[in-house]
């Protein structure tokens, strides 16, 4: 099968943890590799304003792996909001791409991509824009459109008092939910939100769990990892991985470690908090928001906390192996990439009981869930876990064992299986001509930097959870 994957506002080749790059980038990267491994031909399209490393800021094509090409569309947009205002232009650009117009299936990630896909389909039905479109119209064929929202505007507004998503997005997501052929939810919690918040037809929503790259994310030697990272063997390491955002709860991490210092100064003196991430979205070019200014002041005032740059996956696993505890204090989270990666690496998490996180972290078994974002409760949970070596070892073992059920090939198979299209058999290879189609310059993945793989995971059938304050 020929599959067109849209990740328009952010490239799957971008470094997670900064700008608009996060778990979705990893999801797209890993899922298209799984589709290709299953014998499908995949064309991925992005209009990421930051461009694709290896193309020097130009529009063009990058060969990721066999049967997977990444295309940078030529659009003049400085950020995600400008892309959202250019849906018609994006649709027309897609209709100029053979990898889009010849697709049997379109898988759109995020609402901007879904809007562009639906608009392109509308334009194709109005008039024949190419020979490919004419053939499709005459034969009655129409590519199925699948969407993964990843985040839902209404849910972000519900879960965070500082979130004010644009009305354009809220209206578009409701429209998308009723127009596409299939909606992919990462967790049962997200499925409920899609149905209740967007009015999606329950029969059109499938839960397809993201996977974990177990060849990369696995338990390892802590002492060796700390030597690599320049960390002392005798200190406790508390890790946060992600963008510096209110919705991600970065402030809770800093405040919890400061609270630990008040409650147990000796323990705090032996604890190092590492924030592995950078600012998000438009923060860097426009100047820091009041939230980031306050966060920066709090970090400067807390001697146990340091900030390090985001790192590619092959380095990130070393941080997971070196740390004692991962903190995931998200205020809204449709899935929870880092909690799943950490679990596979044998690192237990203290996480918020929101969104998809309870599907990854089983309270009292593979980690700890906290029902609110009161730093005092997080400090209490942190102190208890740091003081109990046996508890951490037990949680780590369970976390690693629990993560084995997550697999990217199963993710891809779940989505394709939900479509139930037996006549769309795998296309075994991309021809040489197809690999060089168009006037774009094609570059191999080896010629670009930061195309490392990361992954995430959750269980398929969540059980009721005991959610605690602190522990």
Regions found by a protein language model. Give the residues of each.
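Conserved acidic donor-binding segment of nucleotide-sugar-dependent glycosyltransferases
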Residues: 363-364, 368-375, 384-390
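Nucleotide-activated donor-binding/catalytic signature segment of Leloir-type glycosyltransferases, i.e.
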Residues: 277, 287-314
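Carbohydrate-associated surface elements
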Residues: 189, 211
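Short alpha-helical donor nucleotide-sugar binding micro-motif in glycosyltransferases
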Residues: 310, 318-323
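N-terminal subdomain of nucleotide-sugar transferases
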Residues: 1-66, 467-471
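A short, well-ordered alpha-helix in the C-terminal region of glycosyltransferases
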Residues: 377, 391-405
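Aromatic "clamp/platform" in nucleotide-sugar-dependent glycosyltransferases that forms part
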Residues: 331
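Short hydrophobic beta-strand element within catalytic cores of glycosyltransferases
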Residues: 348-351, 361
């Amino acid at each position: 099968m020929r599959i067109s994957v849209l990740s328009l506002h952010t490239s799957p080749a971008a470094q997670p943890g900064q700008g608009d790059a996060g778990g979705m980038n990893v999801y797209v990267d890993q899922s298209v590799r799984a589709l290709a491994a299953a014998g499908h031909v995949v064309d991925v399209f992005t209009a990421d304003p930051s461009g694709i490393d290896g193309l020097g800021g130009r529009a063009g094509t990058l060969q990721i792996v066999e049967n997977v090409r990444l295309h940078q569309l030529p659009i003049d947009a400085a950020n995600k909001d400008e892309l959202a205002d250019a849906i018609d232009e994006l649709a027309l650009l897609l209709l100029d791409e053979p990898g889009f117009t010849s697709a049997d299936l379109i898988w759109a990630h995020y609402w901007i991509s879904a809007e562009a896909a639906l608009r392109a389909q509308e334009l194709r039905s109005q008039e024949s824009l190419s020979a490919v479109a004419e053939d499709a119209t005459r034969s009655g064929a129409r590519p199925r459109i699948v969407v993964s929202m990843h985040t839902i505007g209404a849910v972000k507004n519900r879960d965070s008092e500082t979130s004010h998503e644009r009305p354009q997005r809220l209206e578009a997501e409701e429209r998308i939910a009723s127009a596409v052929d299939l909606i992919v939810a990462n967790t049962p919690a997200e499925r409920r939100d899609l149905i209740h918040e967007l009015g999606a037809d329950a029969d059109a929503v499938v839960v397809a769990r993201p996977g974990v790259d177990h060849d990369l994310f696995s338990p390892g030697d802590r002492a060796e990892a700390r030597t690599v990272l320049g960390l002392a063997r005798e200190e406790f390491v508390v890790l946060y991985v992600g963008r510096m955002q209110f919705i991600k709860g970065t402030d809770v991490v800093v405040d919890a470690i400061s609270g630990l210092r008040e409650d147990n100064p000796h323990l705090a003196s032996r604890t190092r908090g590492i924030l592995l991430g950078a600012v998000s979205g438009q923060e860097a070019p426009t100047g820091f928001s009041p939230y980031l200014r306050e966060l920066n002041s709090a970090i400067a005032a807390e001697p146990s906390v340091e900030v390090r740059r985001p790192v590619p996956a092959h380095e990130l696993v070393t941080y997971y192996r070196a740390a004692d505890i991962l903190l995931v204090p998200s205020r809204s989270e449709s899935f929870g990439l880092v909690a799943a990666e950490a679990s596979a690496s044998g690192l237990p998490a203290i996480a918020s009981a929101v969104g998809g996180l309870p599907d990854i972290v089983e309270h009292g078994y593979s980690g700890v869930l906290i029902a609110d974002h009161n730093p005092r409760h997080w400090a209490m949970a942190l102190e208890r876990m740091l003081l109990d070596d046996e508890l951490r070892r037990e949680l780590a073992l369970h976390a690693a064992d629990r993560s084995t059920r997550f697999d990217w090939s199963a993710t891809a198979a779940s989505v394709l299986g939900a479509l139930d299209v037996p006549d769309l058999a795998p296309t075994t290879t991309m021809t040489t001509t197809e690999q060089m189609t168009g006037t774009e310059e094609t570059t191999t993945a080896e010629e670009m930097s930061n195309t490392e793989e990361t992954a995430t995971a959750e269980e398929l059938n969540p059980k009721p959870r005991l959610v605690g304050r602190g522990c």
